[in-house]
Amino acid sequence: SGQNTTNLLTVSFRSDATQGALADLLMRHQLVIVDGPSALRLYRLEVSKDQDPVAVALALRRETGLIESVEVSR
């Protein structure tokens, strides 16, 4: 197989975000939690192969009711 690039985002959710809202968010953006929460409440999310991680990160940044920060991990 060719280059195996991982499409990971590092995300912190707002402390008042509900499990249901987060599950809906993950489903809508086709994201899978691969790690977390860390001590700093950071999660690593995997972006599906057919999506651009940068575009997904931008979309998540607009979800201000649920998301505190989003970084694209390389």
Per-region residue spans from a language model:
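Conserved short beta-strand edge segments in small beta-sheet-based binding/regulatory domains
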Residues: V34-P37, T64-R74
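A generic structural motif
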Residues: R41-K49
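Helix N-cap motif at beta-to-alpha junctions
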Residues: S15-T18, S48-V54
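Short amphipathic alpha-helices in soluble, non-transmembrane regions
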Residues: L22-H29, P53-G65
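Juxtamembrane extracytoplasmic segments of single-/few-pass membrane proteins
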Residues: S1-L42
